[in-house]
Amino acid sequence: MSKNISLDEIKKFWPDKAPDINIVQKYIKKYENEKIVIKYGGNVLIDRNVFNNFISDINVLNRLGLSVVVVHGGGPRIKRELDKRKIVSKFINGLRVTDKNIIDTVEEVLIDFNKDIANSLKKLGSQVAMFHTKTDNIIEVKPEREELGFVGMPNKINDSLIHKALNENKIPIIAPLGLGKNEQAYNINGDTAASAIAKKLKSRRLILMTNVEGVYDDQKKLISEIKPFDLENLIKWKVVQGGMIPKIENCVDAVQNGVKGVVILDGRKPH
């Protein structure tokens, strides 16, 4: 438990239907001096009720004194805006091919979503720090590969701004965008961005909230725990396909580079 807050105080803002506070007390103590990076997928947050639950949970973690960093997606919002503008896009191995028209739309949508998350947290009393390509960019990128256009791979994370925000008890809200040469904006896979940030911070946990229960084996059974080598085999054997491939690759990369553990959770479930 946070050293500066009593159990009685916690009970005042503990959400309805959340786990028993007495059960989670030990986890609060366990993580009070650790950093947690939470990536919430845009496919989950398109549902406003789920979005509101997410905002409530992040606010609670912040009030408990935990150091939480939020990285968000925005895929459905991007698709909706591209459709509205009659711009066609395609995917290669789960990554959106991004030309000049598309990157302009992606940047606009993700920054708006970043503001939406920040403003929603502010309404609950949390302090936030927004990070994207127009405000305190923290991700420098290099092009992922030519066929993907303006899709970037994180090359450098300016973690000093993240640490500053956390030290001020602010929640960093990070859009999966970065800048390359000539200040050109690049789209970044949300899981890739979250993994890069978690590695830089050496976070205790990287939590990927998605719109599925988790990762399944070749018998379609949910996997509760798995080692990096076995995850790589799931890709090799084509058990994992599509958009789950970069997610799994980022999980493996994270735990092999300083992150103590990665959890994939069904973000549609409250608390």
Question: Which role does the model predict for each range below?
Answer:
Residues 1-269:
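Nucleotide/pyrophosphate-binding catalytic subdomain
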